[in-house]
């Protein structure tokens, strides 16, 4: 560290970091004691962190990088670790990686007082102080290090405002070089390692594609974007894509970049984080469109790509006029929809029967087909399956021109195989590329979902599950006319069926009183199957029982699976559906 004014012995950090029992030192990870009065830094950061905290473990390397860079630049800066670990060994192992000072773990009173003084409600937490006066520069040190890195030093309000002004000026004067270049780098790279001058992008439309290796939505998005990219190249459009990797290591970067046909900012370049901040990245996938003049045309066209898939190239360069044309084409495509246009992609012109037999899609043409989006890991899907199997068999007894195709969201072949083994219908193979496109066409955001396709290949309804649960096999063929007819009949039956049922009751499966409630579909917390129309419900606990289950003499209905699979990342299960988040 560079020399700076000593912290005052009777104020500032000298007072803040000392203990009531006279301790006047901090520790290095070598166990050496450092007099607090000897700290020469003018800016001191208190780092509240703990080894058991995953966000802390992710942030600590970033703070170490910033600290080392500031020290190497001769900046007057110090960090003091304030541990939230539960034992000395955990403290020692975590502190061993840190190049700065720490309050002794044994001084639990001082640690508690610091947490109380700065009202620490969560970690990691970085409070940055004027060492001499103890004045708080900021309590948002974690966010500032994430956003600005060492440029935020000395973390004063004046410096942060200055950086914001610089960002505004940069946006006002944005060029392709200011976006992608640095004082020491005027090139991008290919996945072969070749350097391509940034000047080659002048006069072109450029997409900035933010990428994280292995993240499902990004992997799916970039596979579609690659098709659009190749098509635009083939028709001679001046279009380029630049990958902006948010991965922290070279292996992940290389794995992401290996199959991409476009350019990238080199791995580890700080410009990647700057661009994420510059364009206020809040979610992935994200694709920013830059015009031929280097100005931003659209902050994010990922939704356009997501909605139209590979056909989105026809909307390039995604102006209002082009998007209107694209929407018209999408409408016309929907109107000309056939079962084969939905289920046939290149050589993928089949679905799977039992024992892996390939059934040509052509054999399904002219039938009413339900597309069943589901997964074994999803509790509502497991609860719905017995009902669906039962009604499927009833429909097939009367109507041979009917079929279901299972479209799985499972991640493992074993789970897929086990779940499919209990289904008497057909399926797409696990991981089939048609699943992604069908999910987009029908905007599937939760499972289980049932989409009904009529004999003419047109969509009858995107929600066949609700009428099937309500009316069973009688809902076939799921047309609006049929459902209106059934609703009239059902309304009368519903009112008649509840005659004689108690309005309220107590049941062994729940502590609170259950109230007879008119409702739509729900999952019974007694037998784990679907129900509708009437439930004995506890609104306070969101607890439901079928009237049949509730009115049994004993509350010994078998409860749900104890060892159910957990939902994978990106899904949350609530009630009778698992949704993407």
UniProtKB/Swiss-Prot annotation:
**Domain (Thioredoxin) ranges:** 1-165, 178-322, 328-488
The GO terms describing molecular function are: thioredoxin-disulfide reductase (NADPH) activity
This protein's record includes keyword NAD: yes
| UniProt keyword terms in alphabetical order | NAD, Oxidoreductase, Repeat
**What would be one Pfam family of this protein?**
C1_2
What is catalysed by this protein?
A: [protein]-dithiol + NAD(+) = [protein]-disulfide + NADH + H(+); [protein]-dithiol + NADP(+) = [protein]-disulfide + NADPH + H(+)
Which cysteine pairs are joined by S-S bonds? none
Protein biosynthesis in keyword set: no
> What are the EC numbers?
1.8.1.8
Q: Which SUPFAM superfamilies match?
A: Cysteine-rich domain, Thioredoxin-like
User: What Gene3D superfamilies is this protein classified in?
Assistant: Glutaredoxin
Q: Which domain of life is it from?
A: Eukaryota
CDD domains with a match to the protein in the record: C1, TryX_like_TryX_NRX
The broad enzyme category this protein falls into is: oxidoreductase
Question: Which PROSITE patterns does this UniProt record tie to the protein?
Answer: THIOREDOXIN_1, THIOREDOXIN_2
Give the function comment from the record: Probable thiol-disulfide oxidoreductase that may participate in various redox reactions.
Similarity remark? Belongs to the nucleoredoxin family.
Name of this chain's protein = Probable nucleoredoxin 1-2
The root-end lineage is: Eukaryota, Viridiplantae, Streptophyta, Embryophyta, Tracheophyta
């Amino acid at each position: 560290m560079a020399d700076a004014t000593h912290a005052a012995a009777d104020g500032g950090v000298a007072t803040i970091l000392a203990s009531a029992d006279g301790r006047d030192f901090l520790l290095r990870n070598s166990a050496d004691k450092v007099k607090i009065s000897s700290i020469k830094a003018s800016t001191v950061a208190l780092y509240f962190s703990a080894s058991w905290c995953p966000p802390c473990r992710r942030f600590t390397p970033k703070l170490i990088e910033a600290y080392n860079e500031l020290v190497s630049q001769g900046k007057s800066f110090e960090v003091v670790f304030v541990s939230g670990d539960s034992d000395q060994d955990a403290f020692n192992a975590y502190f061993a990686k840190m190049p700065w000072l720490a309050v002794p773990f044994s001084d639990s009173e001082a640690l508690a007082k610091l947490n109380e003084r700065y009202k620490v409600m969560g970690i990691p937490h970085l409070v940055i102080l004027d060492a001499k006066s103890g004045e708080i520069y900021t309590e948002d040190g974690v966010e500032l290090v994430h956003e600005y890195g060492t440029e935020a030093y000395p973390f004063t309000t004046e410096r942060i405002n200055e950086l914001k002004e610089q960002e505004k000026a940069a946006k006002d004067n944005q060029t392709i070089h200011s976006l992608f270049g640095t004082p020491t780098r005027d090139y991008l790279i290919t996945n072969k390692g070749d350097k391509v001058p940034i000047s080659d992008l002048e006069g072109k439309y450029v997409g900035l594609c933010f990428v994280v290796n292995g993240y499902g939505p990004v992997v799916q998005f970039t596979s579609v974007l690659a098709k659009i990219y190749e098509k635009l190249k083939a028709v001679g459009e001046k279009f380029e894509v630049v990958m902006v990797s948010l991965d922290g290591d070279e292996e992940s970067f290389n794995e992401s970049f290996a199959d991409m046909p476009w350019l990238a900012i080199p791995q580890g370049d700080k410009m990647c984080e700057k661009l994420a901040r510059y364009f206020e990245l809040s979610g992935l996938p994200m694709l920013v469109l830059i015009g031929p003049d280097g100005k931003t045309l659209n902050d994010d066209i990922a939704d356009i790509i997501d909605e139209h898939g590979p056909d989105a190239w026809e909307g390039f360069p995604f102006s209002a006029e082009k998007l209107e044309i694209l929407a018209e084409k999408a409408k016309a495509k929907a109107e000309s929809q056939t079962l084969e246009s939905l289920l046939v992609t290149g050589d993928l012109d089949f679905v799977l029967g039992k024992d892996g037999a390939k059934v040509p899609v052509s054999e399904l043409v002219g039938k009413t087909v339900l597309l069943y989006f589901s997964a074994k890991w999803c509790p509502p899907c497991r609860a719905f399956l017995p009902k669906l199997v039962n009604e499927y068999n009833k429909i097939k007894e009367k109507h041979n021109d009917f079929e279901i195709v299972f479209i799985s969201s499972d991640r493992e072949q074993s789970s897929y195989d086990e779940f499919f083994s209990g289904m008497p219908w057909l399926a797409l193979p696990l991981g089939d590329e048609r699943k992604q496109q069908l999910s987009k066409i029908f905007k599937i955001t939760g499972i289980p979902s049932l989409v009904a396709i009529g004999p003419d290949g047109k969509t009858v309804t995107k929600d066949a599950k609700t009428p099937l649960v309500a009316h069973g096999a009688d809902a076939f063929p799921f047309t609006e006319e049929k459902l209106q007819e059934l609703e009239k009949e059902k309304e009368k039956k519903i009112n008649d069926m509840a005659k004689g049922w108690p309005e309220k009751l107590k049941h062994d499966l729940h502590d609170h009183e259950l109230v007879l409630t008119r409702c739509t579909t729900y999952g019974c917390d007694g037998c784990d199957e679907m129900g509708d129309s009437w439930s004995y419900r506890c609104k306070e606990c969101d607890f439901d029982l079928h009237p049949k289950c509730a009115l049994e003499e004993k509350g010994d209905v078998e409860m749900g699976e104890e060892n159910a699979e957990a939902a994978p990342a990106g899904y949350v299960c609530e009630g009778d559906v698992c949704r993407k988040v």
